[in-house]
From Swiss-Prot:
Pfam families: Orai-1
Description of the deletion phenotype: Worms exhibit an inhibition of intestinal Ca(2+) release activated Ca(2+) channel activity but has no effect on the initiation of posterior body wall muscle contraction, intestinal Ca(2+) oscillations or intestinal ER Ca(2+) store homeostasis. Attenuation also affects sterility and brood size.
Region (Disordered): 62-81
Identification of the protein by name: Protein orai
PANTHER family: CALCIUM RELEASE-ACTIVATED CALCIUM CHANNEL PROTEIN 1
Tissues where this protein is expressed: Expressed in gonad sheath cells, hypodermis, intestine and spermatheca. Coexpressed with stim-1.
Species in which this protein is naturally found: Caenorhabditis elegans
GO biological process terms held by the UniProt record: innate immune response; ovulation; sexual reproduction; store-operated calcium entry
Leader sequence residues: none
Membrane topology: Multi-pass membrane protein
Top-rank taxon, per record: Eukaryota
Residue intervals annotated with topology Cytoplasmic: 1-122, 168-198, 252-293
Length: 293
């Protein structure tokens, strides 16, 4: 293949003597001759051409490396563009995988968090109500002293139980929300305190609240000289307390039975799946054993 010769281009190159970059024209014959000379010389010594051969490097269209926008890339940019960007000293440290919980453990995490939130709200409301009742009630000289002692004891127990539940919920809940649904969550080892907070807030605290209402009725109606109204209101609160206990038992029983039923259904489904798989394996092994015989 002959070398292309353009007289006008040659004259233009001669006039541009101030160019710092040397321009060359390379043909296929030059490259073949250079390769032949290099093979004859044994591949060692000085460079085979008096001029540098052009080198081209592929660079993928990625901004992760050091590539330029004009499409002309360097070897260094093409290599670094395929790598992950390096983190600087000021970047945040990647903590990696912290151990995500499975579905059953995630359910326990969500349940514990919901229990703590409900306990904190209920305990704060009822404890504040009991303190307001104790302060705002007006006591007379005619109020029986044993009734005042009962009121003070019930109010102290009510506030103490709800404050304990509030303290446990406010101490555990922030750490649960900070760690998230991972194995670092404290609800796994602090399950006893979560259940205790739920028991204080919903069961014992609500029963003491009903007793508190009955004692307040006695104090108010005795102050006006009409204790019969206190007897009537207390008689109305007794069936309410019984219904409260019965409903709590029924709800707990139905919840446990539902959980056990779901567990039994999952076990039966898994057993059927394993039986079907075992039957399929037997059916595939039977013809081979017959052929061997």
């Amino acid at each position: 293949m002959p070398r292309s010769h353009d007289p006008s281009r040659v004259e233009l190159l001669r006039k541009e003597g101030g160019l710092t970059e040397k321009r060359v024209s390379i043909s296929v014959e030059d490259i073949r001759g250079a390769v032949a000379n290099w093979k004859n010389s044994g591949g060692a010594g000085d460079p085979i051409t008096p001029y540098p051969l052009p080198q081209f490097f592929l660079q993928p269209p990625s901004t992760a490396g050091g590539g330029s926008r004009n499409g002309v890339g360097s070897k260094e940019g093409s290599v670094t563009s395929l790598r992950m960007p390096l983190k600087k000293a000021g970047d945040d440290v990647d903590l990696g995988h912290r151990g995500e919980l499975d579905l059953s453990e995630k359910y326990n995490y969500d349940l514990s968090r919901a229990q703590l939130k409900a306990s904190s709200r209920t305990s704060a409301l009822l404890a504040g109500f009991a303190m307001v009742c104790l302060v705002e009630l007006q006591y007379d000289q005619s109020t029986p002293k044993p009734l005042l002692i009962v009121l003070g004891v019930v109010t102290s127990l009510l506030v103490s139980v709800h404050l304990l539940a509030l303290m446990m919920s406010t101490c555990i809940l922030p750490y649960m929300e900070a760690t998230g649904c991972t194995q670092d969550s404290p609800h796994i080892k602090l399950k006893f305190y979560i259940d205790l907070s739920w028991l204080f807030s919903t069961c014992i605290g609500l029963l003491l609240f009903l007793v508190e209402i009955g004692v307040i009725f006695y104090v108010k109606f005795t102050a006006v000289g009409y204790p019969t109204a206190g007897y009537i209101t207390t008689a109305m609160l007794v069936p309410v307390g019984v219904v409260f206990v019965v409903f709590s038992y029924l709800i707990h029983k139905n919840r446990v039975s539902h959980s056990l039923g779901r567990f039994k259904h999952k076990v039966d489904t898994m057993k059927q799946f394993l039986d079907v798989e075992a039957n399929l394996q037997k059916s595939t092994l039977a013809p081979s054993t017959i052929r061997d015989i």
